[in-house]
Amino acid sequence: MYSLSISTSGKYISVAIHDDKLISSSSVLSENGTTNLLMKSIDEITKKSRIEKSDISVVYLDIGPGYYTSLRIGLAVAQGVCGSLGIPLVPVNGLDALAFAAHTGHRKICTIIDIKREEYAFCLYKPVPGGVVR
């Protein structure tokens, strides 16, 4: 089975389909019409990957921090996908995801996300076996 990951927390709408490895992804600059753009992106990567939506077994959603309205749109679309397919929705903190992706096992990490209007969210992490902790 496949997983769908969605991020609408920033200037870009990003979606990806993966199992043990990345199968297909898309990242598109969002100016207006986030809902339509997100649905179109999901449709495009499923078609490109030749995967039926019914083959998706879980949706991972970036729940922020980030742009408030875009996060709400991402949540609404993700809930609709999960509700229609009867699959779980797993929330993922964007700062935690960045730290985990950047960890080397040896250095402290500070993740920073622009949350609009010259405001930023950040968090410090330290390495532990298998990942990072706040």
Show the residue positions of the predicted features.
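Generic, well-ordered alpha-helical segments
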Residues: 30, 34-37, 69-73, 90-91
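Short glycine-rich anion-binding loops that position phosphate/pyrophosphate groups of nucleotides
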Residues: 11, 64-65, 115-118
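N-terminal beta-alpha supersecondary unit
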Residues: 1-63
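Surface "functional belts" at beta-alpha junctions
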Residues: 21, 88-134
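DPxDG-like acidic metal-binding loop motif
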Residues: 58-89
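Glycine/Thr-rich phosphate-binding loops of Rossmann-like dinucleotide-binding domains
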Residues: 14, 69, 119
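Phosphate-handling active-site elements
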Residues: 48-54, 83-94
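Short amphipathic alpha-helical face segments that pack within enzyme cores
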Residues: 37-40, 76, 80, 97
